[in-house]
UniProtKB/Swiss-Prot annotation:
<comment type="similarity">
    <text>Belongs to the ammonium transporter (TC 2.A.49) family. Rh subfamily.</text>
</comment>
<dbReference type="GO" id="GO:0005886">
    <property type="term" value="C:plasma membrane"/>
</dbReference>
<feature type="transmembrane region" description="Helical">
    <location>
        <begin position="125"/>
        <end position="145"/>
    </location>
</feature>
<feature type="region of interest" description="Interaction with ANK3">
    <location>
        <begin position="416"/>
        <end position="424"/>
    </location>
</feature>
<dbReference type="GO" id="GO:0097272">
    <property type="term" value="P:ammonium homeostasis"/>
</dbReference>
<feature type="transmembrane region" description="Helical">
    <location>
        <begin position="280"/>
        <end position="302"/>
    </location>
</feature>
<dbReference type="GO" id="GO:0008519">
    <property type="term" value="F:ammonium channel activity"/>
</dbReference>
<feature type="topological domain" description="Cytoplasmic">
    <location>
        <begin position="83"/>
        <end position="90"/>
    </location>
</feature>
<feature type="topological domain" description="Cytoplasmic">
    <location>
        <begin position="201"/>
        <end position="219"/>
    </location>
</feature>
<dbReference type="InterPro" id="IPR002229">
    <property type="entry name" value="RhesusRHD"/>
</dbReference>
<keyword id="KW-0812">Transmembrane</keyword>
<keyword id="KW-0472">Membrane</keyword>
<feature type="short sequence motif" description="Basolateral sorting signal">
    <location>
        <begin position="429"/>
        <end position="432"/>
    </location>
</feature>
<feature type="topological domain" description="Extracellular">
    <location>
        <begin position="241"/>
        <end position="250"/>
    </location>
</feature>
<dbReference type="Pfam" id="PF00909">
    <property type="entry name" value="Ammonium_transp"/>
</dbReference>
<keyword id="KW-0325">Glycoprotein</keyword>
<feature type="transmembrane region" description="Helical">
    <location>
        <begin position="251"/>
        <end position="273"/>
    </location>
</feature>
């Protein structure tokens, strides 16, 4: 049945109107609230007695560059494995991250850098905003191919707000340690997306099952994303940590953990694979689990051996998750996790939080010496014992899971609004629904889609 002109025109205007509305509202809020901080304001910086080389830009910007590449290149290409959804994977990653970094600058600014009624921004604001965008993209991975761009933008509005609140509760109120974001980024983003996917469950998704797979070149593009993420992950985990030994130690622990998770992934993939063959899905994803698992404990005295052990465990568990748990997740729990974020970010994120609990509980003055104050200031001041700090870390994990679950459920209800126009079951994982695809005539490409029922939407 042909759509009425009104219904046909609505999706055409939906995305541009929403983009204009969100950008306009954000710009107004920036004009009212956002100002340069003392290291970026020309008058304030030159008023002080210091060298230009003392500016924090020179210490933080290299890390920011690496994080920026991870968000826009790494995540985008990692999700480009679907044979008919490469434009959307990379393009919608670009769109969501570009909006999320603006919106999160405001949300995080209200919680962390509001002084005199203004939000003061710096290179640290850019790093933190990219971290928030990373959490959004993790959630995007769980619902990849099953939602439209307007739905994704509204998801970003809600998730960024909840991310900021959860981060404030953990880092400021509970004062837990989570520099690399095992809890605030990976666990939150994964379970927000998984609950969202459960609410948006599509019982008739089998109609698009033939497109929910990769081809040789799409897997190769995804592997490019993996390599970018793998190379820059030490910068990701160490970017917000204390300059000096803390940042150095975080990068080192992440470096070793990633290498061990890669070996664990190859070993387990060959072990569980048919006739001992490697599965590219495992290599693309589980090899990165080592970066996730040391997100919390990376700046602590984890030891190089501890980093290797944690990384190997994460890579092994993640691979087993892709092989055995993902099918159960869909069949028994009705969670259609397109990218397997539960295996790459969810389980390793929880393991990383628990690893943090263990390492914090073992912290002593003898192990940290004078550096105890920079890693665990409350323990150094005698306001908390190592065990009580460990309990706060554990409570922070539960708080994160609560915010993610409630937020994902609310997001799912929001995205189910009929006016948002999600793709039909037979049109999921298909670029041509939203993009001009070169070399394909629209009627020829859409022919098989139109033969299916068009109104079975989430």
């Amino acid at each position: 049945m042909a759509r009425s002109p009104r219904r046909a025109g609505a999706p055409r205007l939906q995305l541009p109107l929403l983009c204009l509305l969100l950008q306009g509202a954000t710009a107004i809020l920036f004009a009212v609230f956002v100002r340069y901080n003392h290291e970026t304001d020309a008058a304030l910086w030159h008023w002080g007695n210091h060298s230009n080389l003392d500016n924090e830009f020179y210490f933080r910007y290299p890390s920011f560059q690496d994080v920026h590449v991870m968000v826009f290149v790494g995540f985008g290409f990692l999700m480009a494995f679907l044979q008919r959804y490469g434009f959307s994977s990379v393009g919608f990653t670009f769109l969501l991250a570009a909006f999320a970094l603006q919106w999160s600058t405001l949300i995080q600014g209200f919680f962390h850098s509001l002084h005199g009624g203004y939000i003061h921004v710096s290179v640290n604001s850019m790093i933190n905003a990219d971290f928030c965008a990373g959490a959004v993209l993790i959630s995007f991975g769980a619902i990849l191919g099953k939602t439209g761009p307007a739905q994704l933008l509204l998801m970003t509005v809600l998730e960024v707000a909840l991310f900021g609140i959860n981060e404030f509760v953990l880092l400021n109120l509970l004062q837990v340690k989570d520099a690399g974001g095992s809890m605030t980024i990976h666990t939150f983003g994964a379970y927000f997306g998984l609950v969202l996917s459960r609410v948006l469950y599509r019982p008739q998704l089998e109609k698009s099952k033939h497109r929910q797979c990769s081809v040789y070149h799409s897997d190769l593009f995804a592997m490019i994303g993996t390599i970018f993420l793998w190379i820059f992950w030490p910068s990701f985990n160490s970017a917000p940590t204390t300059l000096g030994d803390g940042q150095h130690r975080t990068a080192l622990n992440t470096y070793y953990s990633l290498s061990a998770s890669t070996l664990g992934t190859f070993a387990m993939s060959a072990l569980v694979g048919e006739r001992g063959r490697l599965d590219m899905v495992h290599i693309q994803n589980a090899a990165l689990a080592g970066g996730v698992v040391v997100g919390t404990a990376g700046e602590m005295m984890l030891t190089p051996f501890g980093a290797l052990a944690a990384g190997f465990l994460a890579g092994t568990v993640s691979t087993l998750g892709y092989k055995f748990f993902t099918p159960i997740l869909e069949a028994k729990f009705k969670v259609q996790d397109t990218c397997g974020v539960h295996n790459l970010h969810g389980i390793p994120g929880v393991l990383g939080a628990l690893l943090g609990v263990l390492v914090v509980g073992l912290a002593t003055h003898e192990a940290y010496g004078e550096g105890l104050g920079s890693v665990f200031p409350l323990i150094a001041k005698g306001q908390r014992t190592a065990m009580s700090q460990a309990m706060y870390q554990l409570f922070g994990l539960f708080v994160t899971l609560m915010f993610a679950s409630v937020g994902g459920a609310l997001g799912g209800l929001l995205l189910k609004l009929p006016c948002l126009g999600s793709p039909a079951d037979c049109q999921c994982y298909e670029d041509q629904v939203y993009w001009e695809v070169p070399g394909e005539h629209e009627d020829a490409a859409q022919g098989p889609l139109k033969a299916e029922e068009p109104d079975t939407q989430a």
